[in-house]
Amino acid sequence: MKYTVTIAMPIYNVAPYVEKSLLSALNQTFVDIEYLLVDDKGTDESMDIVHRIISMHPRGKNVRIIDQKYNQGTAAARNVMVANATGEYLFIMDSDDVISPDCIDILYQKMKQYSVDFIAGSFQRQTWDGDIY
């Protein structure tokens, strides 16, 4: 199936962060999204958390996991994402990032409004307790 947007995320030893990050991606207001996760063979329970979330989330059926044979690092994981994304647009986020529920919708609307091939958004630093700095 061809999607409008692919949200891609590498997974490697991010157990403390991956649930909040993945849920922020899955809970987007934009509908036509493929989720592409690259299992970069970490040694913690990150992938157990990922499998639990996608088994229960309504958008879990839109998640594709690519298993690396062994840990290859962030750059290799990103190359795998680019090579395997089926969306017209690709949004790469790290597995400790959290995006607002309307992030993809806003970025998509701006891309269409200005007829551009690439767009970047701003960010803010925030602790896991919610403090912004």
Each predicted region: which residue ranges?
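Nucleotide-sugar donor-binding/catalytic module of glycosyltransferases
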Residues: 1-133
